[in-house]
Amino acid sequence: MGKSEADEDAQFLPMNRPRSSSAASQTSSDSGLSVESALIRNSTYGKTPDEAYNPAGDPRYRDIEDGEAESDQPFLPSRKGSGARARRVFWGLLLLCLAGWVLAFVLFLIQGRSGYSATSEELQQHEADSSAGVTSDGKPVTLKQVLSGDWLPRSHGIAWIAGPDGEDGLLVEAGEDGGEGFLRVKDIRARHGDDAGTLKSRVLMKKSTFYAGQRSILTRLTWPSPDLKKVLVLSDYEKNWRHSYTGLYWIFDVDSQTAEPLDPDVPEGRVQLASWSPNSDAVVFVRDNNMFLRKLSSDKVVPITKDGGKDLFYGVPDWVYEEEVLSGNSATWWSNDAKYVAFLRTNESTVPEYPVQYFLSRPSGKKPLPGLEDYPDVRQIKYPKAGAPNPVVNLQFYNVEKNEVFSVEVPDDFADDDRIIIEVLWAAESNVLVRATNRESDVLKIFLIDTESRTGKMVRLEDIVGLDGGWVEPSQSTRFIPADPAAGRPNDGYIDTVIHDGYDHLAYFTPLDNPEPIMLTTGEWEVVEAPTAVDLRRGLVYFVATKEAPTQRHVYQVQLDGSNLKPLTDTSKPGYYHVSFSDGTAYALLSYQGPSIPWQAIINTEGDDVVFEETIEENPELARMVETYAIPSKVFSNITIDGFTLQMVERRPPHFNPHKKYPVLFFLYGGPGSQTVDRKFTIDFQSYVASNLGYIVVTLDGRGTGFIGREARCIIRGNLGYYEAHDQITAAKMFAEKSYVDESRMAIWGWSYGGFMTLKTLEQDAGQTFQYGMAVAPVTDWRFYDSIYTERYMHTPQHNPSGYDNSSITDMAALEENVRFLVMHGASDDNVHLQNTLTLIDKLDLSNVQNYDVHFYPDSDHSIFFHNAHYMVYERLSNWLVNAFNGEWHRIAAPVPDNSMWQRFKRALPVFVH
C-alpha cells in the first residue's frame, strides 16, 4: 500500500509512508527519464479526462422561500359585499394562511434543515489563511474543481542526466513535435543564455512518432542511453499493478532517427522491464518473467533464464514485493562496470491465490469462449495474507562476459521462509551491499558480497525489536561513497539511515565492513528518505529533514565527517521543500511546496552560498484563484496526549465566527510512519468541505505516524488501531468542549488505513463523541491484508493472535451506538480486498445492526476510478455528510407515518433548537 506524496489527492489511498526509488538502476524502465513523466509534470497534475462532469446545482443551503414563486396578491373584497361574506373571506384567508404555514413547515421538515445553516453570504467571506498568508473574499471551492485537479499546483519535472564524459547540469526535456524537437538534452546553463562551456542543446528525437519498418510507433515512455546515442522507447503501454506495466520496446538511433524492435525475432513480445547497461552497449530486459540480454552489436537476444513463468519471477517483483518492498517494477541492478547484473529470483509456488473479479471489463486480456461472455473476468493474484506462505526471494548474479548465472551463499543469512530483501546496492565494481530483514521486519542484516571471489559476509546486524520494539521500514536510499585518498577517504563506504537516540538519522560507514558509523546528523528530529545527493568532490551530503518542525521539510548539507551542518533553504519561516540534484550536484531543482503558493527554481550549489539561477514556475494562475475563492483558514497546533506531542491542523470555514456552533469532521489516515498534517499548499476534499459546506475539518497525526520519533511511532506495534483511535477520540473530546463546536454533530472519515481507523474509532468511542463516520476501502481484519506490510507492524497471527483479535473490527454493539456510518469499497480492489467489507457486513447482519449504508463500485480497484467512480465516491461522501449534519439520519432511524406530524415535530424539535 505505497503512499506517495505525489499521488493525486492520494493521501487517501495507500497504506505505508512514501519510500524513495533506488538510484542503483537509473537507466531502467523504472526510472524517471520518461516522456510521460515529463509531459505530465509540465502540465497540471491530476487533470481528469472527464470534462463532462457537471454536478447539478447544489440546493442544500437554499432557503425554501427563496425558491418559491411569489404568491398571488391578496383578494380584495368588494365594498358591496355583506358582513357575512366578509367574515367568510376573513376565515378563508385565515385558513389559507394557516395551510400555507403548515405546508411551509412540512417542507421545512422534509428538507432536513438543521440548527446550522451556511448561507450564500457567509460563503463569500474569507479570513487570513495562517498557513498561506493570503486574504481573499470570493466564491466557495467546488468539488468539481478539486476532483478535476484545478487546485493542484503546476509543477515541472527535470530529468537530470550525466553527460557521456561526466558533464554536469544536463537535463532531458520532452515537448511537442516540431520546434526544438520532441526529446532533447540541454545544458542548464544554456537555458538562460550562458553558453560558456556548455554542450548546448542536442535533439535525441525529432518527433514522438516514428517508423520501425512499415509500422508507425507512438512514443509513450523513453530512456536515453548513457552515451546519448540511442533511446529506449516504450509503446503500446498497458498498466499492470500500481507500479508495473508492459509494452513494446524499441531501440531508437539518434543519428539516423530510425528504430528497430528490442527483440527483432519477437517484435510483438510484451516486455515488463528494460534497462540500459552503464556503458550503453546492451539492454537487459524481462519478458514472461524471464530475463534476456540484447547486445547492440548483435540482432540476437541471449536468454539469461528459461524457467520463469506463473510462479517464478526473474528481475521483476511479484505483487507483494512491488507494493510493499521495492515500490517499483524493477528488481534488476547493473554493476557500475557493466560486467554483472544482479537480480531477484522470486518463487511464488507456495503463495496462495486470491481471485479478483471484474464484471464489466476484462483486464486479463483473455477472450471468453463462445457462450461464456456473461461470466466475469477473474484475475488470480498470488497474494500472501498475514501468516500465509511468503514468496521465497533469492539474489542471483549474471556474468555478462561468461553468460553465466550464479548465486553466493552467505553465512548468517536468513532462512528462505524468513527473508525479505529490501535493497541491493552495487559498491565499487564487484562488491554488492544487500540489506535484508526477517519476516517480521525487526531484525536487519547488511551483507557484503564479492562477485569476483563469490564470497560474502554479514557486516552489520541491528536488532530493532531489542532496541525499541519497533520495525524496519523498507527503503532504497542508501548511497555508496567511493574511496578517494586525495579527498580524505582512504576506503569505500556508504551512507545509511539508522536509529540514533530514538530518531532516524544519517550515518556514514567506512570501510564497507565497519559496523561502527560516523554520525552525520543527531537530535530530536528526523531525516526524510536521505541522503538526497552527495557531492564527492567537496565531501558534502545533501538531505531533507524535519529539523525545524515535524510538519516542515527543509534542505540541509553536512560534511562527511558530520561537521558544518547548515540549511540551504530559508528556515526563518515555515516551509515544505523538495529537491532534485543534478548528477554532479552542482545544480538542483528546488521545489517550494508550501505553505504559500508553490514555486520552483534552479539553484547553483557550487559556491558557499546557494545561487538562484532561474525561476521556472511561480503558479500565477493558482495565485489568482486563491484571490478569487474563499479558502479555509488553517490553524496548526500541538496536542499532548499521554505525554506525546502530536501535530494537528484545524481548517476553519471562511468568515469563521467563534460565536457560532459548527459541525466538525475529522479526516485521518494514520498509517504507521505516514503524515497527513504538513505545511504543503493543499486544496483538497477537506478544503471543499470547509469552504463550501461550512464545516470545520480537523486532522490529527496521532501515535504511530511519522517524524515524531520512534517512541511515539513504535508504541502501536502489535495492536494496530488502539492508540491511534484513542488519540482521535481524545482530540475530538477536546474540540467538543470548544464554544464554537456543535458537539452533537461530529463525524470522522478516512480511506484505506484511514477507513480502518474510522471504523476502529467509531468502535472504541461507541457513540460517546462521534456520531457519524465514513470509511472507504477499509481493512476490517488484519488477517486479510498482505503479509509483508501487516507483519511488520503486527507480527504474524501465529505469534500475536490476541493482537489480531483486538485490531479487528468486532464490536458490532459499539458500532450500533453511533447514529449512522457509511462504508464504500471497490469491488475489484487487489490491495484491500472486498472480503474486508463483506465480512464486516456479515457481522453486522448477525448482530442485527442496521444503522449503516454501504456502496460498492464495480471493477474499481483501491483508488476507485472505474467508470466515473472517483467522482461518484466523493459526491456520495459530500451528500452523506450533509444529510448527517442536517439530522436526516435521525429521522431515518425513527420513522413515523406522515399523518403523525405532531410526533414528528416533537422528535425533530431537539435538532432545531440545539
Swiss-Prot record:
<dbReference type="Pfam" id="PF00930">
    <property type="entry name" value="DPPIV_N"/>
</dbReference>
<feature type="compositionally biased region" description="Low complexity">
    <location>
        <begin position="20"/>
        <end position="34"/>
    </location>
</feature>
<feature type="compositionally biased region" description="Acidic residues">
    <location>
        <begin position="1"/>
        <end position="10"/>
    </location>
</feature>
<keyword id="KW-0325">Glycoprotein</keyword>
<feature type="glycosylation site" description="N-linked (GlcNAc...) asparagine">
    <location>
        <position position="806"/>
    </location>
</feature>
<dbReference type="InterPro" id="IPR002469">
    <property type="entry name" value="Peptidase_S9B_N"/>
</dbReference>
<keyword id="KW-0812">Transmembrane</keyword>
<keyword id="KW-1133">Transmembrane helix</keyword>
<feature type="region of interest" description="Disordered">
    <location>
        <begin position="1"/>
        <end position="81"/>
    </location>
</feature>
<feature type="active site" description="Charge relay system">
    <location>
        <position position="752"/>
    </location>
</feature>
<dbReference type="GO" id="GO:0004252">
    <property type="term" value="F:serine-type endopeptidase activity"/>
</dbReference>
<dbReference type="GO" id="GO:0005886">
    <property type="term" value="C:plasma membrane"/>
</dbReference>
<protein>
    <recommendedName>
        <fullName>Probable dipeptidyl-aminopeptidase B</fullName>
        <ecNumber>3.4.14.5</ecNumber>
    </recommendedName>
</protein>
<feature type="glycosylation site" description="N-linked (GlcNAc...) asparagine">
    <location>
        <position position="347"/>
    </location>
</feature>
<keyword id="KW-0472">Membrane</keyword>
<dbReference type="InterPro" id="IPR002471">
    <property type="entry name" value="Pept_S9_AS"/>
</dbReference>
<feature type="transmembrane region" description="Helical; Signal-anchor for type II membrane protein">
    <location>
        <begin position="90"/>
        <end position="110"/>
    </location>
</feature>
<feature type="topological domain" description="Cytoplasmic">
    <location>
        <begin position="1"/>
        <end position="89"/>
    </location>
</feature>
<dbReference type="GO" id="GO:0006508">
    <property type="term" value="P:proteolysis"/>
</dbReference>
<feature type="active site" description="Charge relay system">
    <location>
        <position position="862"/>
    </location>
</feature>
<keyword id="KW-0720">Serine protease</keyword>
<keyword id="KW-0926">Vacuole</keyword>
<dbReference type="InterPro" id="IPR001375">
    <property type="entry name" value="Peptidase_S9_cat"/>
</dbReference>
<feature type="topological domain" description="Vacuolar">
    <location>
        <begin position="111"/>
        <end position="914"/>
    </location>
</feature>
<dbReference type="Pfam" id="PF00326">
    <property type="entry name" value="Peptidase_S9"/>
</dbReference>
<keyword id="KW-0645">Protease</keyword>
<dbReference type="GO" id="GO:0008239">
    <property type="term" value="F:dipeptidyl-peptidase activity"/>
</dbReference>
<keyword id="KW-0378">Hydrolase</keyword>
<comment type="similarity">
    <text>Belongs to the peptidase S9B family.</text>
</comment>
<dbReference type="GO" id="GO:0004177">
    <property type="term" value="F:aminopeptidase activity"/>
</dbReference>
<keyword id="KW-0735">Signal-anchor</keyword>
<dbReference type="InterPro" id="IPR050278">
    <property type="entry name" value="Serine_Prot_S9B/DPPIV"/>
</dbReference>
<feature type="active site" description="Charge relay system">
    <location>
        <position position="829"/>
    </location>
</feature>
<feature type="glycosylation site" description="N-linked (GlcNAc...) asparagine">
    <location>
        <position position="638"/>
    </location>
</feature>
<comment type="function">
    <text>Type IV dipeptidyl-peptidase which removes N-terminal dipeptides sequentially from polypeptides having unsubstituted N-termini provided that the penultimate residue is proline.</text>
</comment>
<dbReference type="InterPro" id="IPR029058">
    <property type="entry name" value="AB_hydrolase_fold"/>
</dbReference>
<keyword id="KW-0031">Aminopeptidase</keyword>
<dbReference type="GO" id="GO:0000329">
    <property type="term" value="C:fungal-type vacuole membrane"/>
</dbReference>
